[in-house]
Amino acid sequence: MVDQVQHPTIAQKAAGQFMRSSVSKDVQVGYQRPSMYQRHATYGNYSNAAFQFPPTSRMLATTASPVFVQTPGEKGFTNFALDFLMGGVSAAVSKTAAAPIERVKLLIQNQDEMIKAGRLSEPYKGIGDCFGRTIKDEGFGSLWRGNTANVIRYFPTQALNFAFKDYFKRLFNFKKDRDGYWKWFAGNLASGGAAGASSLLFVYSLDYARTRLANDAKAAKKGGGGRQFDGLVDVYRKTLKTDGIAGLYRGFNISCVGIIVYRGLYFGLYDSVKPVLLTGDLQDSFFASFALGWVITNGAGLASYPIDTVRRRMMMTSGEAVKYKSSLDAFKQILKNEGAKSLFKGAGANILRAVAGAGVLSGYDKLQLIVFGKKYGSGGA
């Protein structure tokens, strides 16, 4: 009998959305149900993750949001195309809804780099202050600056996920019960890192452009000031002119490292804590597993958040006179000049953004049921 495929519940999506971009965005992993509810998981953004019961080697990470869409081989082409398209619409809706919080997160995270470049007059005092100043200086619509690049990124990322999924699944096909925990664990990190880096290679420049646009504050000083970039195409044009291709990929190496670091923390924590806490009546409890996955997702996300900060701070130096020599140099300079706290700036807004995205996805699923009578692929925020 063929296993029945069902879409993830609202609770599962909420867990997957919480602490997403990032390290932008950013390891997300798919939620996998046991037995007849098993779902083929696609890759996600490495800064955050949904949880699994238990985590398996089928989870591969890239910079995409967690989107539950099956490959053409797993379903008819027409249904696949509908799933892919509706997943894109869902991604666009959820990303657009959460875009204001996303921009605030990026502004707070990169404000020290902006101040050094003379593009911000004084630091933000918090999330509320950042919202208020941005709306006052640039207008309400500016909260969505950079969102176009973020939405566009969904489609090539999903296509690349399908292309790399089967290859790396076969290449690192280790089983925990057959090959042992450590070989399975290493294979999981390798497959996630390889798949993530492969997809990231093609879409990284869009993440770079999104970051630069979001951090392009209009009024750095009293009296206002012009923007550095006029739009997405202008980011590419100016970066290529001043720094060449390398400018579009600044921070790429540390981004790949972030995929492996996040997955290592996530799997390591889950496998270590689950046997200790989920015992007796809690062993088969959905809510207990949900809570554990939620806590571990946040723990791994916060622990790897400094990597996201370093890579984005490196992005901000493209086109500038002074650049970091490497990711290690960036890390050392930030610690020396700004303190460890600076590595976690924007983490609070990141959590809010994920919660907002999860809420929008839940509502969008309900809308699909009303309009189409069924749910199609869902895009993450």
Curated annotation (Swiss-Prot):
- Detail the disulphide connectivity of this chain as listed in its UniProt entry: none
Q: Name one GO molecular function term.
A: copper ion binding
User: Which keywords label this protein?
Assistant: Antiport, Membrane, Mitochondrion, Mitochondrion inner membrane, Repeat, Transit peptide, Transmembrane, Transmembrane helix, Transport
For this protein, the record's InterPro entries field holds: ADT_euk_type, Mit_carrier, Mitochondrial_sb/sol_carrier, Mt_carrier_dom_sf
Q: Which residues form a coiled coil?
A: none
List every stretch annotated Important for transport activity: 311-316
Free-text note on domains in this protein's UniProt record: The transmembrane helices are not perpendicular to the plane of the membrane, but cross the membrane at an angle. At least 2 of the odd-numbered transmembrane helices exhibit a sharp kink, due to the presence of a conserved proline residue.
Which family does this protein fall into?
A: Belongs to the mitochondrial carrier (TC 2.A.29) family.
Name by which UniProt lists this protein:
ADP,ATP carrier protein 1, mitochondrial
